[in-house]
Amino acid sequence: MSSALILVAGLITLPGVAAEKKTVTTNMKSNVQTDYMNGLLKLALSYSNKEYIYATTSEVYSRPRVMESVKSGSISVMWGGTSEEMERDFIPIRIDAYRGLMNHRLFFIRQGDQARFDRVKTFDDLKKIKFGQGRSWQDASILEGAGLQVVKATKKPSLYHMLDGGRFDAFPRGANEVWTELSAFPNLKLTVEKNLVLIYPLPTYFFVSPKDPELAKDIEFGLESAIKDGAFDRYFYNSPEVKEALGKADLKHRHAIRIANPYLPKATPLDRKELWLDLMGESPKSVSEPIAEAAQ
């Protein structure tokens, strides 16, 4: 072997040229959405020249605890609906992980209540319905801001039991969430409402610890790269969660009622059409839209 080849071989094995290893910690799995988001995170970071190692918390943290942990840096990244507050406290990756699918809310209702919802045609009709929501959820603020009645609970599982027990009338969930969640509560007399879809813009973003801006850059670079080369679309459409939602929700044949999201940050990239699905045959709507308009 020539001296030049020996030198090259030696350089290849030097520790200094090995890929940098970095641990990314997320909250322990709590639902099927965790699988989707973790998978998308790994797809994004596969475009980085760093070697990422993935870890989770030792137990499922509550939402407030997750937020505090991301602020402190003990959790690297979380995900959820955006707001001015979220984008102030964390580093937002402004690419909707679900391409607008989560903006479309279907209702859990009690079995036997469908006839009541068949009579809902306008926003004023919707104001007669009591909705269940998580106490710290952005959705609760959006519904209340629109003038809708909201009953809150601290823990999400409680909401299904409260609906079953008659504490409120409907529990709105993302179109990609309802089917899996329905199967998780087989002993409750609940079903998915058949004809309505409530729409408001609430993108699902990755939010990175302010202590780790390099991770935020890698996630954003990876998602943008995956959009450009088609990997994002392949991942999205091959997700069992998304396949089930698009197959069962029948969104184009539902009666749509839109409400505004007054908490949607101005930096939301509604003008980037490649980031959003056209699920209702329409373009994404901005927060300036009247809250009482129903799609005809």
PLM features: residue spans?
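A ligand-binding cleft/hinge motif common to bilobed small-molecule-binding domains
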Residues: 69-71, 78-90, 171-193, 197
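Extracytoplasmic small-molecule ligand-binding "clamshell" domains
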Residues: 18-90, 219
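Ligand-binding clefts/hinges and TM-proximal coupling segments of bilobed small-molecule sensing domains
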Residues: 134-146, 223-294
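Short helices/loops that flank or line small-molecule/ion binding pockets
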Residues: 60-76, 145, 157-176, 185
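Ligand-binding cleft/hinge of the Venus flytrap
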Residues: 40-53, 119-125, 135-155, 182-187
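Periplasmic-binding protein-like
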Residues: 100-106, 113, 184-220, 242-266, ...
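A conserved helix-loop-strand patch within extracytoplasmic ligand-binding domains
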Residues: 96-141
